[in-house]
Amino acid sequence: MEIILVGHAHTAKAFKEAVEMIYGEVPNFHPIDFTPKEGLQSLTDKIVSAIEPGKTASTLIITDLFSGTPYNASAELVLKKKAADVVAGMCLPMLLEVAVNANNMSVSQLVSHLMKIKEEFSTSLSEKMTTNAKEDDF
């Protein structure tokens, strides 16, 4: 499975570097940064260039923000069948989950898995402490 990361400024490249720092090399992750000097068409062209011929059905695009330019460009490509799916809300825990599972699941299985566990990607110390205190009461 090929994973294309698309984000504002240099978030895509930074996220790939962070994943590699923790997980190891991820050659199937392809970061695309959307800079202030670019428009929708130039970003779309960069994404199309990153999709390997013959691998559209096994290409997942992950963007930083729902409804932002990276997401909109990616969604258009998915609707045109140039990629399998697009997921918004890129974060390090999500990308580590993708790195672990990308070679063991299809795109649709991985997307379904991510949607099931997405609430595990963030937490609050005070919430954890409250939950643990309630559990200790029993």
From Swiss-Prot:
Q: Where in this protein does the record say Phosphohistidine is found?
A: 8
PROSITE patterns with a match to the protein in the record: PTS_EIIA_TYPE_4
This protein's GO cellular component annotations are: cytoplasm; membrane
Q: What is its main location?
A: cytoplasm
One term of GO molecular function: phosphotransferase activity, alcohol group as acceptor
Q: Where in the cell is it found?
A: Cytoplasm
- Biological-process GO terms, alphabetical: phosphoenolpyruvate-dependent sugar phosphotransferase system
Which residues catalyse the reaction?
Answer: 8
Keywords, ordered alphabetically: Cytoplasm, Kinase, Phosphoprotein, Phosphotransferase system, Sugar transport, Transferase, Transport
Q: What induces it?
A: Induced by L-sorbose and repressed by D-glucose.
Q: Where is the PTS EIIA type-4 domain?
A: 1-125
Q: Key word Acetylation present in the record?
A: no
Indicate yes or no for the key word Transport.
Answer: yes
What the entry says about domains is:
The EIIA type-4 domain is phosphorylated by phospho-HPr on a histidyl residue. Then, it transfers the phosphoryl group to the EIIB type-4 domain.
Q: What does this protein do?
A: The phosphoenolpyruvate-dependent sugar phosphotransferase system (PTS), a major carbohydrate active transport system, catalyzes the phosphorylation of incoming sugar substrates concomitant with their translocation across the cell membrane. The enzyme II SorABCD PTS system is involved in L-sorbose transport.
NCBIfam families, per this entry?
A: EIIA-man
Q: What is this protein called?
A: PTS system sorbose-specific EIIA component
Species in which this protein is naturally found: Lacticaseibacillus casei (Lactobacillus casei)
